[in-house]
Amino acid sequence: MPELSLLSALDAARIQWYHFKAIIVAGMGLFTDAYDLFCIAPIMKMISQIYYHKDSIGTALLSTSYAIALLGTALGQLIFGYLGDRVGRRKVYGLSLLIMVFSSFGCGFSVCTTRRSCVMVSLGFFRFVLGLGIGGDYPLSATIMSEFANKRTRGAFIAAVFSMQGLGILMSSAVTMVVCLAFKNAGEGSSEKTNVAGLETLAPPESDIAWRLILMIGALPAALTFYWRMLMPETARYTALVENNVVQAAKDMQRVMSVSMISQITEDSSSELEQPPSSSSYKLFSRRFLSLHGRDLFAASANWFLVDVVFYTSNLLLSQIFNFSNKPLNSTNVYDSAFEVAKLAAIVAACSTIPGYWFTVYFIDKIGRVKIQMMGFFLMAVVYLVAGIPYSWYWSKHEKTNKGFMVLYGLIFFFSNFGPNTTTFIIPAELFPARFRSTCHGISGAAGKFGAIVGTVGFLWATRHHEEDGFPDVKRVRIAFLILGGVCIAGMIVTYLFTRETMGRSLEENEDEIVSTSAGSSPANELLRRQY
């Protein structure tokens, strides 16, 4: 059967240049995603000194500034995940990138510079739109990479795409440091009051340009990748199994990859009468879908929700616990807080985050997804408990260079990325049928981003009370750490009870579909029935 031959050829294909090209093209979207999502912490430090120098930013406004992009990301995952299955992965892949490019520039050119409230509303709007594009990139990149990859190294390829986030975090920190240093050195260091956005402030006027420049630079990687995305063909699995056009699928793969048997598949398929696309034997969220895939969807969504509660809260700790704003404000040290937060983020990314990603790339197809995910949740729980119980001892003097705490903080990110933060991105791209794959990945990812909102907003409100020296209340931070440890334990339990291993199996094997001969089967379902 031509479909079976095509999928078998893809699963057995040797590693070749196009696989690495696909990793770069798909990964640059996630690179941009990470840049845009994680540059906001140091930027909010700058905005607080430029527009709110007499008062600190309220918890409600700070929570909204973090949550608005995450909300857009969740909606983008749902919308583009659905569109990826409805009209094709390739057709909407470039659209998500364009949204990121234009909204990044929109953030920089926030349309009102006369009042700080207007600036924040404009920035919030464009951050929300930016989130839509970022969210769209998650299910499309994961699905495309999973459908291009061979069976033996599929996990490593998807993990490599996701690992570009680490480089995006590192780049956002580097850009922030360079911009802050350049603007600081260009300033005169005076303490004279100036006018920024209609407000009297010690911050120099050019500081209002600095944070906008950081945001706009995030558009460049996405813009440079757009052309190459448009050259990518539709995935063979979507064309063959959803559109029922195995001839076109074989031709597309022959154009970009050297796969044995592709030429023969094209010849054999051309001699057969093409069947028109038929409706799926069951619909999304139907009783049959839930009986076959409900457990997998629950496990993928719950685990992503839990890990994002922890991961995004951990990132927020960077700008809240490590307080660098105790110097008197003048026209140059308006950049100091942002620089210090970005520098620490760069150190954590280089020493913990990026190595964690690449440990997963190396071990994912050797150890398996479930074992890595359980190990990551367990060790993160241990680190949170070790850091949380004696928290007041670590920070009794609030030493920003406390080496013991910094090591523990870095281990959180290492075991997050050599663990559930990466595997929750991989598993939903491998479990579901081709016609539901992008949608289910989007649902799982959206659950994760709602977890990120819960963690981010919850932590900000839980630690809103500060001590006399301006640091968050020690008791509240300790409780937050212990709660995060409990969340990790819950993730380990959910993984153990509900998550299925996908290593070493084809995507069609992982679908685990049971097709009845009495039901009206599509060619894709008939393929699965004959194969198994």
Curated annotation (Swiss-Prot):
<feature type="transmembrane region" description="Helical">
    <location>
        <begin position="293"/>
        <end position="313"/>
    </location>
</feature>
<feature type="topological domain" description="Cytoplasmic">
    <location>
        <begin position="84"/>
        <end position="91"/>
    </location>
</feature>
<keyword id="KW-0769">Symport</keyword>
<keyword id="KW-0472">Membrane</keyword>
<dbReference type="GO" id="GO:0015415">
    <property type="term" value="F:ATPase-coupled phosphate ion transmembrane transporter activity"/>
</dbReference>
<feature type="transmembrane region" description="Helical">
    <location>
        <begin position="479"/>
        <end position="499"/>
    </location>
</feature>
<feature type="transmembrane region" description="Helical">
    <location>
        <begin position="92"/>
        <end position="112"/>
    </location>
</feature>
<feature type="topological domain" description="Extracellular">
    <location>
        <begin position="176"/>
        <end position="207"/>
    </location>
</feature>
<keyword id="KW-0592">Phosphate transport</keyword>
<dbReference type="GO" id="GO:0006817">
    <property type="term" value="P:phosphate ion transport"/>
</dbReference>
<feature type="transmembrane region" description="Helical">
    <location>
        <begin position="442"/>
        <end position="462"/>
    </location>
</feature>
<feature type="transmembrane region" description="Helical">
    <location>
        <begin position="155"/>
        <end position="175"/>
    </location>
</feature>
<feature type="transmembrane region" description="Helical">
    <location>
        <begin position="23"/>
        <end position="43"/>
    </location>
</feature>
<feature type="topological domain" description="Extracellular">
    <location>
        <begin position="393"/>
        <end position="406"/>
    </location>
</feature>
<feature type="transmembrane region" description="Helical">
    <location>
        <begin position="372"/>
        <end position="392"/>
    </location>
</feature>
<feature type="transmembrane region" description="Helical">
    <location>
        <begin position="125"/>
        <end position="145"/>
    </location>
</feature>
<dbReference type="GO" id="GO:0005886">
    <property type="term" value="C:plasma membrane"/>
</dbReference>
<feature type="transmembrane region" description="Helical">
    <location>
        <begin position="407"/>
        <end position="427"/>
    </location>
</feature>
<feature type="topological domain" description="Cytoplasmic">
    <location>
        <begin position="229"/>
        <end position="292"/>
    </location>
</feature>
<keyword id="KW-0812">Transmembrane</keyword>
<feature type="transmembrane region" description="Helical">
    <location>
        <begin position="63"/>
        <end position="83"/>
    </location>
</feature>
<protein>
    <recommendedName>
        <fullName>Probable inorganic phosphate transporter 1-9</fullName>
    </recommendedName>
</protein>
<keyword id="KW-0813">Transport</keyword>
<feature type="topological domain" description="Cytoplasmic">
    <location>
        <begin position="1"/>
        <end position="22"/>
    </location>
</feature>
<keyword id="KW-1133">Transmembrane helix</keyword>
<feature type="transmembrane region" description="Helical">
    <location>
        <begin position="344"/>
        <end position="364"/>
    </location>
</feature>
<dbReference type="InterPro" id="IPR005829">
    <property type="entry name" value="Sugar_transporter_CS"/>
</dbReference>
<feature type="topological domain" description="Cytoplasmic">
    <location>
        <begin position="428"/>
        <end position="441"/>
    </location>
</feature>
<dbReference type="GO" id="GO:0015293">
    <property type="term" value="F:symporter activity"/>
</dbReference>
<feature type="compositionally biased region" description="Polar residues">
    <location>
        <begin position="515"/>
        <end position="524"/>
    </location>
</feature>
<feature type="topological domain" description="Extracellular">
    <location>
        <begin position="463"/>
        <end position="478"/>
    </location>
</feature>
<dbReference type="GO" id="GO:1901684">
    <property type="term" value="P:arsenate ion transmembrane transport"/>
</dbReference>
<dbReference type="InterPro" id="IPR005828">
    <property type="entry name" value="MFS_sugar_transport-like"/>
</dbReference>
<comment type="function">
    <text>High-affinity transporter for external inorganic phosphate.</text>
</comment>
<feature type="topological domain" description="Extracellular">
    <location>
        <begin position="44"/>
        <end position="62"/>
    </location>
</feature>
<dbReference type="InterPro" id="IPR036259">
    <property type="entry name" value="MFS_trans_sf"/>
</dbReference>
<dbReference type="Pfam" id="PF00083">
    <property type="entry name" value="Sugar_tr"/>
</dbReference>
<comment type="similarity">
    <text>Belongs to the major facilitator superfamily. Phosphate:H(+) symporter (TC 2.A.1.9) family.</text>
</comment>
<feature type="topological domain" description="Cytoplasmic">
    <location>
        <begin position="146"/>
        <end position="154"/>
    </location>
</feature>
<feature type="transmembrane region" description="Helical">
    <location>
        <begin position="208"/>
        <end position="228"/>
    </location>
</feature>
<feature type="region of interest" description="Disordered">
    <location>
        <begin position="509"/>
        <end position="532"/>
    </location>
</feature>
<feature type="topological domain" description="Cytoplasmic">
    <location>
        <begin position="365"/>
        <end position="371"/>
    </location>
</feature>
